Amino acid sequence: MGEQLNGLKRTHMCGELTVEDVDKSVVVMGWVQRRRDHGGLVFIDLRDRTGIVQVVFSNEVSSEAFEKVQSVRSEYVLAIEGKVVKRAPENVNPKISTGEIEIYANTLKILSKSETPPFPIEDRSNVSEAIRLKYRYLDLRRPSMQQNLMTRFKITKVVRDFLNRNGFIEIETPLLIKSTPEGARDYLVPSRIYPGKFYALPQSPQIFKQLLMISGFDKYYQIAKCLRDEDLRADRQPEFTQIDIEMSFVEVEDVLKINEKMIAEIFKETLGIDVPIPFKRLSYQESMERFGTDKPDLRFGMELKDLSDIVAQSEFNVFKTALKNNGSVRGINVKGAASMPRRQLDELVEFAKTYGAKGLLWIQVFEKEVKSPATKFLSEEEMKKILERLEAEAGDLLLIVADKDEIVFDTLAHLRLELGKRFNLIDENKYEFVWIVDFPLLEYDEGEKRYVAKHHPFTAPKDEDIELLEKEPLKVRAKAYDIVLNGTEIGGGSIRIHDTELQKRMFKVLGFSEEKAWERFGFLMEAFKYGAPPHGGIAYGLDRLAMIITGSDTIRDVIAFPKTQNAVCLMTDAPSEVSEEQLKELHIKVDL
């Protein structure tokens, strides 16, 4: 059985001891990273979340501690009392923060023993993610994982400090709410007290934060858990954390300005980086035209160019068909890549096809000639204008896609990113922020044969576009904004509708009958009757923001206990079956 502390108190963290502590008597506690036996001396590397300190056990200093340490192995939990000693110059270890000192142990308590762990507790450990997730409590002992979670904590601390300083109030909203599915599926919770009725777990605190604005809390925030029963996708979690913010009596500009200051403070405090503000801004339309996506990575160029007008009269069938079907012809210039081998060009063609393109036209620009499968279909004048539009020089490779706009944009956006990586055009140490604004308010869902909200049904249309809501819904722009960092959307929000009549019109355009709208959102519509201020806000994905700041490859590395890509917890084996008795209490029958 492990020993008890019996009043022994920790005086210092392992990684915080320095030469200033020499000759002090200290008590440290932690896990054994490594044990080395040098005959008359035993060396223990003791680890806690702050780092490692070397502890020396000598028979001459304490025969009792020296005898006891013989049984100690990796991951044993120890409490050690001893004296801090300066290391001899030749024994200094510059790789650790405590490398100039060591502790000579007087007392040793073995608080807990450990079996041999299934993998080494070190960052170099080459172990599968499945094993790491099964033994997550061991994985979290690794320095990189501890650093990730400490950085995540630092982000939330900066957010809280900044918002508190700026007059915001942290308010919690319910986790058991009414199901109002619009977008992803709700997680449902059966009510035992009301058989046949269900709560939903919140996909976001959206409606409640709007109700808080109507309640008079004009500056709200919350670090909120959100849950969405989404189809399985790479790097998505069924539960995730949002930095949720809402403000009253504001317009778009007010929301963007305070959020820029907050983001700048987060990056200053966590990475020591000065982020220039204000951030760049692109309209949704401009972002799509220039980068093929509303999540552009601005760390490199290779922008899309529209060639449709140049080839409008072309006899080339590929171009002709695309333009006839209201599509477009667009291209990018891969500087200095003209000599790309045919095999790699063919790979790019196949890559383009995975995004729905029927093909990919390439043009190699050399000093004295232009090589392309399309030379025989394009006139000399057309080719000349294409080269001019794409600012082609000798040595460049031009890639062109002709199809429906959505396919052209999607294909070229992915090609641009792929080639940016291949040719090392992306500076990994750069942070490029951009606000994407003026989103379309609505999209048309071919499957459901109705208009759906691009963001959510409470987003306000731009004032000048309100009159188009019923006549030309797809032309209506929203007072919505996303914040994109290095090609990843880290947050998004909007100014909300605060007028009952406008909200009714919005529901009608979305195909909700008045009855259906009241059934789902009646409590919000009722609240609007009693004086709602203009309000708006934003929500950030904390997991994704932490992933970028820590330089992690996946959001699972910045969440303490994540699910797998299949939404399973390998450590606790959730989700799991429950007993018949539990189901009976809830009046539920499982029909598989």
From Swiss-Prot:
Segments of this protein annotated with the region Aspartate: 206-209
InterPro entries: Aa-tRNA-synt_II (IPR004364), aa-tRNA-synth_II (IPR006195), aa-tRNA-synth_II/BPL/LPL (IPR045864), Asp-tRNA-ligase_1 (IPR004524), Asp-tRNA-ligase_1_N (IPR047089), Asp/Asn-tRNA-synth_IIb (IPR002312), AspRS_core (IPR047090), GAD-like_sf (IPR004115)
Major localization class: cytoplasm
Keywords attached to this entry: Aminoacyl-tRNA synthetase, ATP-binding, Cytoplasm, Ligase, Nucleotide-binding, Protein biosynthesis
Superkingdom: Bacteria
EC number in record: 6.1.1.23
GO cellular component: cytoplasm
GO biological process: aspartyl-tRNA aminoacylation
Subcellular compartments: Cytoplasm
Disulfide-linked positions: none
MF terms in GO: aspartate-tRNA ligase activity; aspartate-tRNA(Asn) ligase activity; ATP binding; catalytic activity, acting on a protein; nucleic acid binding; transferase activity
Function recorded in the entry: Aspartyl-tRNA synthetase with relaxed tRNA specificity since it is able to aspartylate not only its cognate tRNA(Asp) but also tRNA(Asn). Reaction proceeds in two steps: L-aspartate is first activated by ATP to form Asp-AMP and then transferred to the acceptor end of tRNA(Asp/Asn).
The family this protein is said to belong to: Belongs to the class-II aminoacyl-tRNA synthetase family. Type 1 subfamily.
HAMAP family, sorted: Asp_tRNA_synth_type1
UniProt-recorded name of the protein: Aspartate--tRNA(Asp/Asn) ligase
Species this protein is from: Thermoanaerobacter pseudethanolicus (strain ATCC 33223 / 39E)
